[in-house]
Structure formats: structure tokens, C-alpha cells
Amino acid sequence: MTIFKNRFFKKYIIFFFLIIFLNFFLNKEIVAHELWLEKNSNLKDKTSIDIMIGQNFKGTPYGFSNDEKEKLFLDNNNIVKDIKQRDGNFPAIQIELNDNYFNIINYESKYSFLEYDNIKTFEDFVKEQNFLDILSIYNSNKLPTENYKRFSKILISNSKDFFQQTSKLDFELIALNSPFDKSNVFFKFKLMEEGKPLGNFQVTIFSKTKENFAQETIKTKPNGEGKIRVFDDRVYLLSAVKIFKPNFIQNLELKSDWVSHWASLTFFPSYN
């Protein structure tokens, strides 16, 4: 019994320090990289979901941390149910779901602070996200600081069931139809900010199979809507990023030169 306890304790300590190591070093290097939710099929009795951090749809799964979470909830037919998770959960989110429904799991992080190591990294980030006007107003004699927040969703279903989600996050991508319904050739979505459509805005579409990866950039229509053609064998990640100067209240709280909000939406049309 003592040997078993010692082995368990050693494994727990190793896992604990591994999570600290990953969080520390990745946070120093990623420069506000994308966060998304990705289905993990390791557990049979529950639906398990990884919190992934990386770029170009390649990332590292993180254990769950309540200190980093602002909101985590399941939305079915606009009925919201908070999801409670334990610190250190790995996979991060473990929940019992009825796949006959159209399930939307929503995760909002707290703000994280970042100071850039060099000006070029900030400029490249701004250019990539198509905020070129920032290049003419930022202070190039000072290393920029930034607070970033992520708003991430994953769609999970094994049926044609669908509902249109009402806006519940400050920055989000909302599904306008179901990617699991085979009669829908295109997946339609809407980008929202504080409950209002965000038109003429850049959205990056990532998709992948085990063999290949694809990326394209589109812009939403003036009404905030967009659409993409979907294929059953690909996993999809839609991403939108907004960079802006903090207002007076935000500046008092966040104390950074810039703020960025990241919205992501993932789904795999052939879950079933």
C-alpha cells in the first residue's frame, strides 16, 4: 500500500511540474497564440475536450485551470448550463453529452498580460490580423504591452438537430446552420461583438486531416455573416482576432498599451 501511494505521489508531482513547465515556457514564447477547443476521444464514458494552444491548428493540450477561466458553459437550445471542472483535469474538459442534440461548449478565458520582446513581432502580428492602421499610431520607441482574452467554442452533435445560439460572449462566432447536417453544403456563421454583427472583418479558416493542412482568409459581409464549404473528413477551426486600444476603464484595470480579443469555433462534420 505504501509503495502504491509513493508511486501515485511521484506521478502526481511529475504531472504537476510538467503543467507548470508547459504553461511557463509556452506563455513566454507564444505571443498570444490561438486557443481552441478540440475533441479528445480518450475517455469512453464521457466526452473529453482538450484546451489547445498553438498556431496554424497545431498546438499543445493544456490541463484545466480555474484561475485562467472566466466562463465555461454548455448551450443547448439557448439553455445555459455551467460546466464545473477540477484544476488539473487532463483532458481539460470532461462532460457527459447527449450527441443527439446540437451541443455548443463555450469557454472564455481571463485576460493574460504580455510584453513583446521586440517591435517586429508586434508589427508582424498586426499585419497578419489586418490592422494596418495601428502601424501609424503605435509608439515604435517602446516595447508594446498587451492583454489578450480568448472566446472559444466547439460544436458537437451526431444528428441534424440545430438551434441558433443567441449572443452570450463579448466576441464570438455563431453558427447559423449545422455542419453535421449533410444537406448543408456550406457552413454559415456570424461574427458578433457585444451582441452586434461585425461586418467586413477578417476571419481565418483552418482545416486539417491526418495528412494535410489548409488555411484561407475571408471577410464577413456587412451583416457579419460568412460561409465556407465543408468536407466530412476535415476538422475545422474558424478564428477572428480584434486588436484595439483600451478605453479609460480598461486601461485602469489592464494597464497595457493594447488589448486583443480572440474568437474561435471548431467542429468535425463526421463526429458520427
Feature annotation, model-predicted:
Residues 70-79, 202-218:
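Short amphipathic beta-strand segments in non-cytosolic proteins
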Residues 15-24:
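Bacterial N-terminal signal peptides
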Residues 110-118, 244-249:
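Short acidic/polar inter-strand loop motif in beta-rich domains
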